[in-house]
């Protein structure tokens, strides 16, 4: 056994040396022969905790058994790993090639990913198309304002193309000057309150604000809290205003309530907005009367939107100037608190219209017909006939047209008046399905109650030219029954305008 032991030990040492030489880690070289090296190995074995070596440190049998089992395990493990080593050796060149080709594969992978991304872009764009369409539909408010301004420009051009425009312009120049002088507040009329606090100026509504219905207007009535004193306040207010303004108790009550609103900031702006809506209300009431005549209404709808836009805004300003005049006088003198000033007519700084109303014996003209001419139809001709002259400050300022007659086209194809004379004095607005047509809560015409005859349209006519007529929102006084004043500009004066228009739905819902 000892011989075998030494042989195995020598083989083990030689094998270890060869393996170490291949791995570039040579073992320590002994200067003695193989036995010396074997002894060195054997002496180190007892120090290990091997099985059977605890009983005797020099027990060679135990040492041999331990070495044999150790070597057997090593051989078995080596044999088991030989196939794996062979496979690794075979696949090593392939692995080297794979490493060399790895950059190319990465490049191909990157190109493939890029191609997939480029293919997916059209799909993403297709998905985003509806969002872009929705964004395009949301037009900014500035663009809408520009469109409304363009409507106003087109309206002016459209009216300028009509053949009767020159005649209408010449017939209304003097009347417009008189209207402005008579109704617009000025510095001379501001006695108690500074003129800067008055409400004045022209207004214009956008086309969108004209597209409202007729069903949201309730009748205006005298408020319950004003019923006891309305006669006194209305009488004092009527004395302060010109007779031709024909202030009604309902209008007096509404102006009275406006000044009682608890508004500390921007009261002037809010009051102006309310006056504009009141004026628009009167225009819409007139249009509702026009709608009753189907033939005339169909002709009105055929007018282009720009022309109707200009007509409605002109009528709006006529009503608005009257409301402004009444508001400024009521707010300045407060007849509900102070009554009538004792110096009315005696003070040189008092309103010229007030002095005229007290001292002048000249008949006052109707507020929406402040013109000194009227249309007289004879046969197929409509001529301007001279009427009485109207003075505003003594006999210095006159507002009358020259006596020269202006001939117009034949009225054979003229339309009937848009608002026919009413036979009864009660023309109140129905109160069923009452809804407010306006957004602002301060502009609501409340409190309103049914049964008030606030709209009277006797002998009132509407001009499609819109340059000098309006809807009259009250009854004409009996003093003028014998000398009925007709509107100076009627539909009969514009036959060619109706011929040149195109069909369309017009302003909705009109």
From Swiss-Prot:
Cite the record's Polar residues compositional bias ranges: 393-405
Report the locations given in the UniProt record: Secreted; Host nucleus
Signal peptide residues are 1-20
Q: Specify residue ranges for compositional bias: Basic residues.
A: 122-137
Motif interval(s): RxLR-dEER: 48-65
Q: Which domain of life is it from?
A: Eukaryota
List, alphabetically, the GO terms of the cellular component aspect. Answer: extracellular region; host cell nucleus
| Stretches the record annotates as Disordered | 111-139, 386-442
Keywords of this entry: Glycoprotein, Host nucleus, Secreted, Signal, Virulence
What residues are glycosylation sites in this protein? Answer: 47
Query: Biased composition, Basic and acidic residues: where in the chain?
Result: 429-442
* Chief site of localization: secreted
About its domains, the entry says: The RxLR-dEER motif acts to carry the protein into the host cell cytoplasm through binding to cell surface phosphatidylinositol-3-phosphate.
The role this protein plays is: Secreted effector that completely suppresses the host cell death induced by cell death-inducing proteins.
Similarity remark? Belongs to the RxLR effector family.
Q: What is this protein called?
A: Secreted RxLR effector protein 108
Species this chain originates from: Plasmopara viticola (Downy mildew of grapevine)
Primary gene name: RXLR108
């Amino acid at each position: 056994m000892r011989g075998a032991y030494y042989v195995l030990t020598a083989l083990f040492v030689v094998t270890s040396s060869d393996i170490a030489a291949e791995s570039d880690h040579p073992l320590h070289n002994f200067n003695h022969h193989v036995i010396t090296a074997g002894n060195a190995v054997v002496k180190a074995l007892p120090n290990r905790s091997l099985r059977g070596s605890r009983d005797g440190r020099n027990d060679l049998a135990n040492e041999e058994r331990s070495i044999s089992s150790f070597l057997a395990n090593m051989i078995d493990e080596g044999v088991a790993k030989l196939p794996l080593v062979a496979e690794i050796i075979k696949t090593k060149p392939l692995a080297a090639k794979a490493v060399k080709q790895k950059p190319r594969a990465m490049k191909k992978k990157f190109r493939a990913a890029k191609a997939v991304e480029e293919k997916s872009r059209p799909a993403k764009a297709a998905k985003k198309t509806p969002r872009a369409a929705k964004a395009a539909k949301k037009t900014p408010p500035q663009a809408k304002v520009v469109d409304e301004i363009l409507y106003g420009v087109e309206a002016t051009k459209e009216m300028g193309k009509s053949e009767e425009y020159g005649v209408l312009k010449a017939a209304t120049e003097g009347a417009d000057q008189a209207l402005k002088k008579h109704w617009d507040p000025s510095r001379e009329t501001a006695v108690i309150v500074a003129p800067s606090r008055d409400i004045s100026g022209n207004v214009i509504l956008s086309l969108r604000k004209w597209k409202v219905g007729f069903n949201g207007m309730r009748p205006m009535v005298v408020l319950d809290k004003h019923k006891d004193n309305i006669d006194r306040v209305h009488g004092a207010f009527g004395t302060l205003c010109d007779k031709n303004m024909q202030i009604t108790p309902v209008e007096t009550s509404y102006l009275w309530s406006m000044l009682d609103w608890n508004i500390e900031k921007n009261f002037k702006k809010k009051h102006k907005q309310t006056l504009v809506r009141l004026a628009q209300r009167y225009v819409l009431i007139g249009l509702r009367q026009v709608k009753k005549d189907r033939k005339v209404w169909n002709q009105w709808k055929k007018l282009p939107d720009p022309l109707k836009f200009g007509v409605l805004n002109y009528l709006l300003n006529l009503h608005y100037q009257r409301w402004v005049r009444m508001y400024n006088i009521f707010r300045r003198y407060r007849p509900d608190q102070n009554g009538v000033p004792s110096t009315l007519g005696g003070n040189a700084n008092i309103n010229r219209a007030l002095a005229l109303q007290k001292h002048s014996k000249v008949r006052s003209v109707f507020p929406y017909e402040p013109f000194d001419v009227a249309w007289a139809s004879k046969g197929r001709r409509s001529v301007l006939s001279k009427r009485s002259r109207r003075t505003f400050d003594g006999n210095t300022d006159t507002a009358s047209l020259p006596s020269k007659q202006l001939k117009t086209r034949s009225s054979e194809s003229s339309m009937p008046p848009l608002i026919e004379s009413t036979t009864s004095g009660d023309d109140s607005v129905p109160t069923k399905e009452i809804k407010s047509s306006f957004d602002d809560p301060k502009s609501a015409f409340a409190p309103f109650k049914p049964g008030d005859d606030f709209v009277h349209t006797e002998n009132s006519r509407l001009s499609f030219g819109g340059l000098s007529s309006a809807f009259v929102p009250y009854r004409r006084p009996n003093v003028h029954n014998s000398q009925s004043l007709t509107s100076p500009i009627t539909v009969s004066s514009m036959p060619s305008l109706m011929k040149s228009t195109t069909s369309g739905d017009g302003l909705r819902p009109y």
